[in-house]
Structures are given as C-alpha cells and as structure tokens.
Amino acid sequence: MREMTPARRLAYALLKPIVNFLFNLIWSTCRIVRIDGEEHVEQISATHKPFIPCYWHQHHFFCTWYMRQLIKRGLKIGFLISPSVDGEIPARLAQKWGGVVIRGSTTRTGAQAMRDMYNVVVKQGISPVSTSDGPTGPIHVFKIGDILLSQLTQAPLLPLAYAANRAWYLKSWDRFIIPKPFARIAITIGAPLTVPKGLMAEDLEPYRLQMQNSLRELTEKAASLVHPAP
C-alpha cells in the first residue's frame, strides 16, 4: 500500500481545490429539469432518523450533488471512502461539502465491517451513502450488503438515480457518467424500503431484487425525462 508521504500530502492539498472547481463547474452549468419523488425524502426527513441512500456506482457524480443538497437541509450524510491514500482527495472533498467521512479498513472482515456500519447508523445517526453495485460490479446488480444493513439497523433504503441528456461515459466497468456542461439533468427518487427483522438469509433475496428493480426503473424513468419520446 502506498504511504502518505509529505510530497503526496502536498500534492493532494493542491489538487483538492482544482477537483472541487471542476465538480462545481459542471454542477453549476447543468440544468435540473426535474427532481421526481422528493416526497419520499420529506417522509424520511420527518422521522429525524438515519436512512441509507442507494444508487448505482455510475450515478455517483450527480447523485453526490443531490447528497450535498440534503446536507444543506441539515441531514447527516456520510460517505464511505477507502482508507488508502487514493481515498484522500475524495475524503477531503466530502469534508469540504459538509459530509461525514467514513473511512473503511482493509483489515476488517465482512462481519466486522457490518458492525462498524451498524455503529455509524445506530450510534452516530449518520445516513451512509451506498453505491449498491460497487465497488467492482457487476453493473446494475444490487449487492446484498445494503439489505443486511437495513435489516440490522432498521434504517430504510432510499433508491435514487439520475440521467443527463448529454454526457461522457467512461470506459470503466460501470460506464461512469459525467454530464457535459449545460446538460439537462433529471433525478428520480423511489419509495423507501426497510427490510424486516427476523428473516433468514434465504428470505432476503426478494428484497434485494425489489431494490435492484427499483433502481433500474428509476434509471429508465430519469432517462425518459431528459430524452422525451418524439
């Protein structure tokens, strides 16, 4: 693992404002044509309890913008970021935007990591953002971890997606989307889902599929809002 040397620390300190400027440049030039389903956010916010925002890894760019709007409303949004030096710039950006940085651990087992996230949600009252098919895919396949976390904490899962009428698609496993300047953006938010306690492992699959289908439908709906049928 690479170490955080003084030279690398200086480089990251210099890069942070540049990256932040580029994010804000694109965010500020894009036009939000619709945010569909905000009543679900209002419903969750009224409980004053943590929740788990979920979206596809490729949607991270503009869903992060929406998370910033929730932070401005006073919601305690957390971002799970790699503990390696590669996570240093994302961590600094998340802090600048007012988010809570949750640094993972490369030495944690699955059970230990789940216990850590339980503490983040239940004891600290943080709503941890999840890219539910990440960090390595397969693309648009909802991972079981979010289902387990909702069951354990009783925090509702909140699915959301976005689409841009003009965008760059990176040649990565997730085809990461970066909207082009002045693109039209639609954000879609689905109904929250809390996974009941007391279910056996084999009973969780329907909930995983429900969230997977919800995100896929929200993705299609967002696309239809920025690419209306002729």
Residue ranges and their predicted role:
Residues 18, 37, 56-59:
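Short N-terminal amphipathic alpha-helix/helix-capping patch enriched in small hydrophobics
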